[in-house]
Design a protein with these regions (language model features):
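A conserved active-site cap/scaffold subdomain adjacent to cofactor or substrate pockets
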Residues: 137-209, 213
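Flexible, glycine/charged-enriched surface loops at secondary-structure junctions
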Residues: 15-20, 171-176, 196-207, 237-238, ...
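Long amphipathic alpha-helix in the N-terminal Rossmann-like dinucleotide-binding domain
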Residues: 1-14
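General beta-strand structural signal in soluble alpha/beta enzymes
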Residues: 18-22, 40, 67-69, 91-97, ...
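C-terminal core of ALDH-fold dehydrogenases
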Residues: 227-337
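Conserved NAD(P)+-binding/catalytic subdomain of aldehyde/semialdehyde dehydrogenases
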Residues: 88-172
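Conserved small-residue-rich beta-alpha loop and adjacent elements
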Residues: 20-82
Length: 337
């Protein structure tokens, strides 16, 4: 189910080649070329993350897909292996952490590494950038910001914060509201939902380190807080959400209304990607998408008439910049008059 939803949504992201021809028959083509190889980091043996990272690579027709996935008690996760086969993965290496990033970059020698991870994994990807490419974002520990008011279902707020915090100790969960009366109710609800949770200790430690409730004075302050936090996941669980959405510019993904919990996007129910910008990088980057698996090359063909008619403009600019060699190169192609 998740595979099909992710495949369908990401297939819609395909771009087209561009071709431009001017009146002198000079031609520029801008072609989309799949990367030759991609390395995918799968944290905590999560098949959902493998699907999010490998399905777009499959659609883009990347030739070689290498997955780094650590073992659990000495064994490979069958769900991850099934997802790998479904997505056409070429090879699986059994290691995790920063060392997996090193393996993908220097031993597997892939063109690009994608996939979220811990602070160590994030730093490792920054260190190997230049030798290989990485996503155009910081894909670190998970984050959620829930925007709620006095009419929002308290249990929906609490369960969303708990579900985000169970990812790990470094996960961040924030509630933003201007209604003081709901704060105590949310705190009690979180404790209630933790009673029988298997990862209770992780959630408690995560909330202690990175849990936050921000009480705002007005709507203007709410917008400022959200855009400054630039959260990975934003839940806008309000009846009057439209007045906020047009002013929110910084978020990895936005879940709108009471029936769209962040957890649904983590498992591909809608079909959008869950590898999203963290640590404020949503201010300048987007979530993982099909374009991450392509590069684009310009193919330029000038005609004799074209360079004769237009070459003088290059000469003017190159002479102005003091790059006479450029001017000579242009003149050598032009018809002498």
């Amino acid at each position: 189910f998740a595979y099909l939803r992710i495949f369908k949504f990401h297939s819609l992201q395909k771009s087209k080649n561009i071709k431009f021809v001017d009146k002198y028959k000079n031609k520029i083509e801008y072609k989309i070329i799949p990367l030759q190889s991609v390395g995918i980091y799968v944290p905590s043996n999560l098949p959902s993350t493998l699907l999010m990272c490998a399905v777009p690579a499959q659609i883009a027709k990347v030739k070689k897909i290498v997955v780094a996935n650590s073992r659990i008690n000495g064994k490979l996760n069958p769900a991850v292996m099934y997802a790998a086969k479904k997505c056409g993965v070429s090879e699986v290496i059994t290691c995790g952490g920063a060392q997996a990033i090193g393996n993908l970059a220097y031993i597997q020698n892939v063109n690009k590494i994608v996939g979220p991870g811990s602070d160590y994994v994030t730093k490792a990807k920054q260190l190997v950038f230049g030798k290989v490419g990485t996503e155009s974002m910081v894909a670190g520990p998970s984050e959620i910001l829930v925007l709620a008011d006095k009419n929002t279902d308290i249990n929906q707020i609490g369960t969303s914060m708990v579900s985000q915090s169970e990812h790990g100790y470094e996960s961040q969960s924030i509630l933003v509201t201007k209604y003081k009366e709901i704060i105590d109710k949310v705190q009690k609800n979180i404790l209630y939902n933790l009673r029988n949770l298997p990862r209770k200790k992780i959630v408690l430690k995560s909330l202690k380190k990175h849990g936050l409730i921000i009480l705002c004075k007005n709507d203007k302050q709410i917008i400022e807080v959200i855009n400054e936090c630039a959260p990975e996941h934003l839940e806008v669980n309000l009846s009057n959400h439209k007045k906020y959405l047009s002013k929110i510019f910084n978020a990895g993904s936005i879940c709108i209304g009471p029936y769209t919990p962040m957890a649904s996007t983590d498992y591909g129910l809608p079909g959008n990607n869950h590898t999203l910008p963290t640590m404020g990088s949503a201010k300048f980057s987007s979530g993982l998408n099909l374009n991450e698996y392509y590069k684009k090359i310009s193919y330029v063909t000038l005609t004799k008439t074209g360079i004769d008619k237009l070459g003088k403009y290059v000469k003017y600019l190159s002479d102005f910049e003091g790059l006479e060699g450029h001017s000579i190169s242009i003149k050598s192609r032009m018809r002498r008059k």
